[in-house]
Amino acid sequence: FRSMKSKRLTLFVLFVVAAVANALACTNLIVGKNASADGSTIVSYSADSYGLFGELYHYPAGMHKKGTLIDIHEWDTGKYLGQIEQARQTYNVIGNMNEFQLTIGETTFGGRPELVDTTGIIDYGSLIYLGLQRSRTAREAIKVMTELVQEYGYYSSGESFTIADPNEIWIMEMIGKGPGVRGAVW
């Protein structure tokens, strides 16, 4: 009888651990124009990890000289990844939204570690904020984000980006092509 209780307890503990492990992920709630009462697009983003506390980072709008370089640091660790050319014009960003009501959230789905471009300069967090600084619409953000990883490489595992503006919402999944291979599959 004790053996059966012990097995049940072990199975219960394993189930709880598995459930908790799966809960450590990001969550996006997405509502399109045709699904909201007033025709708004709605996106909520929560980082279900212990390390993110909802800081509202501010990137002011600006005009930049041609050839200006900016440092890129990995979002999660702060590790220096390299430099990229700054856009001539950038837009005001607070948190995960810019002055044109463009918003970008993410959900990590991981993937095979050998697909991370370990020589890449752009990680998922930098990609979000560069997209917001350089884009007015969701479609433009998709173009900017994919061009950046094509030029500089994608230094992250699999991500699902939620990209929304007042008119439409897109979900773009992205995963690298491997070490030293620029671009991403999206």
Regions found by a protein language model. Give the residues of each.
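Intrinsically disordered and other compositionally biased segments
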Residues: 9-14, 160
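Second-shell loop/turn segments in exported
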Residues: 116-117, 126-135
